[in-house]
Amino acid sequence: MGIIDEAKRGQITDEMRAISKLEGIPVEKVRNRISEGKIMLIRNAKYPSRKLVPIGKGLTTKVNVNIGTSSEVVDLDMELQKVKVANKWGDTLMDLSTGGDLDAIRRDIIKASDLPVGTVPVYQIFIESFKKKSGGAYFTEDELLNTVEKHLKDGVAFMTIHAGITKDLAIRALKSDRIIPIVSRGGDMIAGWMIHNNSENPYRKNWDYVLEMFKEYDAVISLGDALRPGATGDAHDEFQIGELLETARLVKSALQKGVQVMVEGPGHVPLNEIAWDVKLMKKLTGGVPYYVLGPLPIDVGAPYDHIASAIGAAISSASGVDLLCYLTPAEHLGLPTVKQVEEGAIAYRIAAHAGDVVKLGRKARKWDDEVSYYRGKLDWENMISKLIDPQRAYQVYTQFGTPKVKACTMCGGYCPMMWAMDQVRKIGSSSSL
């Protein structure tokens, strides 16, 4: 029995209690929202991760870190270093490897990760088909489904399943005047398979069996957005919305079967359209968790897309997004280094909290209030210890040596907090004031 079925029966499990304690909300509310599909526990029940990661309504915004090899760069040691970065800064981790021994790489990443690990199974079967049959679209439906099952057996907790795109949508998108017809790698693979084989989406054709597999492991289906906009000029066109409508129907069928499901979102979206993108998705799907790639509000930001997209991510988080998929400085340019992975993860950690201050209110802002209290007292030790990156903060604080006065090296003796504390002491000691 999966966690949704348990919640629908009114049961309160140890996992629900753990979520309640972690997030600071009543356990009955956790149970009820799980039963409605509004809270998911990202896990593979047979191979639970070391970190508990719930996402959904009323919970803190979580951050996903993408790593993985490419056909150009296969360096497992580097990817395992990225896992360490993800363990420190992230909540979930996706292995998007497309180069090397994909089975071995995935298993090593899962072993090294404290976090639930996700994959895109069509990558593997497409690449294997390309190598063995001289064409990526030559794989069979059974081979795709067997790959999904293999990933589940390895302990994968969630998978991007591009089931929303139909053959008709794919053909029309490719013939359209979209700036970039398809930017999703997995979505493009499924589209190519449908056109090559003149057949409907293999995930859709075998949807009931896909649900059975995920139900067995109580893992999470992440419904991919194959037709997400890859340019701000393509945002919210008929193809993105058409796929979302198909996805919403799949969400309902998954929840009816007691299968955990979330929906993936764009992408490239102008700043003024981000909030209503979230509202539209939540309305169409009944409020299941939303997993969004930023979004990027501009297309010209590389090599600073981690900054540009964090702006969009803060707005999407504040508007109700539950899981943010980070971008790195290498986005749109190449495979990220370990350092670039860290830069992206930190930017998104900041964006997630900025959104939570709006979405969760005082519960999230307590952290900021505590830092501000110590800052006002010039209590550097306590203030720095509470910051998002204490180690880096201390390095900056001491980069010109230890300040000669109680203030920092920016204001020195002219620090307003130092002056204010002195005036408070004078007011307190004067009987005439």
UniProtKB/Swiss-Prot annotation:
GO molecular function: 4 iron, 4 sulfur cluster binding; carbon-carbon lyase activity; zinc ion binding
Binding-site positions, [4Fe-4S] cluster: C408, C411, C415
Binding annotation for substrate: N66, M94, Y123, H162, S184, R185, G186, D225, A226, L227, R228, E264, Y291
Domain of life: Archaea
Metabolic or biological pathway: Cofactor biosynthesis; thiamine diphosphate biosynthesis
Keywords from the named record: 4Fe-4S, Iron, Iron-sulfur, Lyase, Metal-binding, S-adenosyl-L-methionine, Thiamine biosynthesis, Zinc
Classification via InterPro entries: ThiC, ThiC/Bza_core_dom, ThiC/BzaA/B
GO BP annotations, alphabetical order: thiamine biosynthetic process; thiamine diphosphate biosynthetic process
Residues annotated as binding Zn(2+): H268, H332
UniProt catalytic activity: 5-amino-1-(5-phospho-beta-D-ribosyl)imidazole + S-adenosyl-L-methionine = 4-amino-2-methyl-5-(phosphooxymethyl)pyrimidine + CO + 5'-deoxyadenosine + formate + L-methionine + 3 H(+)
Named cofactor requirement(s): [4Fe-4S] cluster
Co-factor binding details: Binds 1 [4Fe-4S] cluster per subunit. The cluster is coordinated with 3 cysteines and an exchangeable S-adenosyl-L-methionine.
Documented EC number(s): 4.1.99.17
UniProt cross-references to Pfam families, sorted A to Z: ThiC_Rad_SAM (PF01964)
Family stated for the protein in its record: Belongs to the ThiC family.
Function: Catalyzes the synthesis of the hydroxymethylpyrimidine phosphate (HMP-P) moiety of thiamine from aminoimidazole ribotide (AIR) in a radical S-adenosyl-L-methionine (SAM)-dependent reaction.
HAMAP family for this protein: ThiC
PANTHER family, per the entry: PHOSPHOMETHYLPYRIMIDINE SYNTHASE, CHLOROPLASTIC (PTHR30557:SF1), THIAMINE BIOSYNTHESIS PROTEIN THIC (PTHR30557)
Name this polypeptide is given: Phosphomethylpyrimidine synthase 2
Gene this chain is encoded by: thiC2
